[in-house]
Amino acid sequence: MNRILAVIFLSLFTFIPAIAEPLYAGIQIDNDSAGVLFGYPINRTYAIEAHYSKSNSRTEHAGVTVDTSSTGIGIVGIAAFPMKLNDVLPYSLFVKGGYQRTTNTDTCSIPTSATLTVPYDNTITSHKNQVIFGGGAELDLAKNLTGRLGLDFLGNKRSLNLAAIFKF
């Protein structure tokens, strides 16, 4: 029994890195949110990437408070164009396009002093399905570490983002 378990664990330690080799994962921050991304490079030029982002904001005015929580989950296709200049680390320019589903939850709180009756609390949740596209540059900082600077367009919103990506 112990030998069988040893063989299973040894197989897992050799199999998992083999299937994870082309994958990459990273963290991304932009103007008002933070998130994670996971990708699969199809070849040197093309990749498929999934991402998840979350942001929270709070607005207060005249006793009225609105808390907004947004989450986005999406998938994009990426086309990268490797570049090389003299005396500069290798980098790539990329364009991307895809789909994102965004969920916004707004919680409004109005105190008794503003309503002159009882306090008012309400939560509204909305969903949007939107096209996302953008572009930017990636710089290989180390063998398995890449830095990314990009500009994304989601609906009528633009966001400048910065990401650190680890390639397995």
Predicted regions and their residues:
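Gram-negative (and chloroplast) outer-membrane scaffold detector with strong preference
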Residues: 35, 39-110, 163-168
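Predominantly the C-terminal beta-signal and adjacent terminal strand-loop region
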Residues: 56-57, 140-168
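Transmembrane beta-strand segments that form the barrel wall of outer-membrane beta-barrel proteins
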Residues: 21-32, 48-50, 93-97, 144-155
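Solvent-exposed loop/turn segments connecting transmembrane beta-strands
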Residues: 26-36, 87, 127-131, 150-163
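Catalytic phosphate/metal-binding cores of nucleic-acid and nucleotide-processing enzymes, i.e., regions
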Residues: 133, 137
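Cleavable N-terminal export/targeting peptides
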Residues: 1-22
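Solvent-exposed loop segments that connect transmembrane elements
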Residues: 106-125
